[in-house]
């Protein structure tokens, strides 16, 4: 079992939770705080070198535009009032996005020249808005009928510009084919699992779902054939006992981060994760990483995988070093530079230029008839450790 030692610890106040980490390798490590600030941290010391006041309320989500971690200089933040985009180099706000329902924004993702924003439930609407990052005034697409509760997680397919994933507290994880103009047609697949804390792509056609109840499963992406061939998911069930944890931080390339919060027994654990198998025998435990408080996010730099950055509800960002050397983990779940057509339908064949957004359907001035959303009898409960968002 490898061991980590603490290199640096920087506190932003015990009542000021550190909720998210995003790398901007050229500028520093970004963290989003519950007081509405984004801080840019020095890679070596973890000290704040820049402050962006993004909101008066918590940073619910934060994403480097385009997922351009090597050279990117734009960062987006989601809060109750708006999604805002800032230039790290100048601190200038270059865009502010709001929606007609004034719904709080709680989730973000950005790839392929696009930014997707998910909202809380407002009335009967919980929406996903997709923007061309060259034109912030009007969304390219609004998906307003596919979720009926908070949209907690959004992920573009890293290799297919036309595929989007969204997860919600309504229990559904939706996969959209953005080549389809009508939302009903664009809703390619619905995974009915549980209230979603996190979801994403493990491989080009494999999807993970992590729930607020600490259940975990892996699902197959359906193709477009007339016969439904979706296999049963690989369902791990409630992982707290089998992974010896109280909660799962998130799923990362090559590892799963878990935590414990019992009094005087708090810890962060890194479980090796490869080929959809979790190695519980060789987990790396950092005792009392953030005291007994919840760890919200971790980050391991691709070129310095002996280093680990963590942030949590104790208000701290901490830097750790693995004394036994770099971890053998990939930077991404697969090689994202390979362009793919994961649904394999004929009308999508050909060269896809990821520099040009391919979402054709733009917002219409006219109001189309509303379609019925899929319904669930009961909203899944959420655990307090996931607030604020």
UniProtKB/Swiss-Prot annotation:
Stretch list, region Disordered: 361-389
Q: Does the keyword Lyase apply?
A: no
Q: Where does each WD repeat begin and end? A: 11-53, 146-186, 289-330
Keywords attached to this Swiss-Prot or TrEMBL record, sorted alphabetically, are: Phosphoprotein, Repeat, WD repeat
The UniProt entry, under SUPFAM superfamilies, shows: WD40 repeat-like
Identify residues that carry Phosphoserine.
351
Other remarks on this protein:
Present with 3970 molecules/cell in log phase SD medium.
Q: Where is the composition biased (Basic residues)?
A: 368-389
Any single GO CC term annotated in Swiss-Prot or TrEMBL for this entry: cytosol
Per the UniProt record, the source organism is Saccharomyces cerevisiae (strain ATCC 204508 / S288c) (Baker's yeast)
Q: Which residues form a coiled coil?
A: none
Question: A single Pfam family, by name?
Answer: WD40
What this protein is called in its record is Uncharacterized WD repeat-containing protein YNL035C
KW Phosphoprotein (keyword) present = yes
Q: Which domain of life is it from?
A: Eukaryota
Q: Which SMART domains match?
A: WD40 (SM00320)
């Amino acid at each position: 079992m490898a061991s980590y030692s603490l290199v640096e610890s920087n506190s932003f106040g015990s009542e000021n939770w550190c909720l998210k980490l995003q790398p901007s390798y050229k500028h520093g490590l970004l963290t989003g705080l519950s007081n509405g600030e984004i801080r840019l941290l020095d890679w070596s010391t973890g000290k704040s070198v820049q402050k962006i006041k993004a909101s008066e309320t918590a940073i619910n989500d934060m994403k480097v535009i385009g997922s351009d971690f090597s050279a990117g200089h734009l960062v987006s933040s989601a809060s109750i009032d708006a999604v805002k985009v800032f230039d790290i180099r100048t601190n200038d706000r270059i865009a502010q996005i709001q929606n007609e329902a004034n719904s709080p924004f709680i989730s973000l993702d950005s790839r392929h020249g696009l930014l997707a924003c998910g909202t809380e439930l407002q009335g009967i609407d919980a929406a996903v808005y997709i923007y061309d990052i060259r034109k912030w005034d009007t969304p390219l697409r609004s998906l307003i009928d596919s979720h009926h509760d908070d949209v907690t997680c959004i992920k573009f397919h890293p290799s297919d510009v036309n595929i989007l994933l969204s997860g919600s507290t309504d229990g559904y994880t939706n996969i959209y084919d953005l080549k389809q103009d009508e939302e009903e047609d664009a809703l390619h697949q619905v995974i009915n699992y549980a209230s979603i804390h996190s979801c994403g792509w493990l491989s080009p056609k494999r999807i993970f779902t992590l729930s607020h109840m600490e259940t975990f499963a892996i699902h197959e992406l359906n193709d477009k054939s007339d016969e439904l061939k979706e296999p049963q998911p690989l369902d791990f069930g409630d992982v707290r006992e089998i992974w010896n944890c109280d909660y799962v931080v998130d799923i990362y390339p090559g590892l799963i981060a878990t935590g414990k919060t019992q009094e005087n027994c708090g810890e962060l654990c890194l479980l090796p994760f490869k080929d959809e198998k979790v190695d519980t025998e060789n987990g790396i435990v950092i005792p009392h990483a953030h005291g007994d408080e919840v760890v919200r996010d971790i980050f391991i730099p691709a070129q310095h995988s002996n280093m680990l950055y963590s942030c949590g509800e104790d208000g701290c960002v901490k830097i750790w070093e693995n004394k036994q050397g770099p971890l053998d983990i990939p930077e991404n779940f697969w090689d994202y530079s390979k362009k793919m057509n994961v649904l394999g339908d004929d009308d999508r064949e050909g060269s896809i230029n990821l520099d040009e957004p391919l979402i054709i359907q733009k917002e219409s001035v006219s109001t189309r008839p509303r379609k019925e959303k899929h319904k669930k009898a009961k909203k899944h409960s959420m655990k307090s450790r996931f607030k604020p968002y």
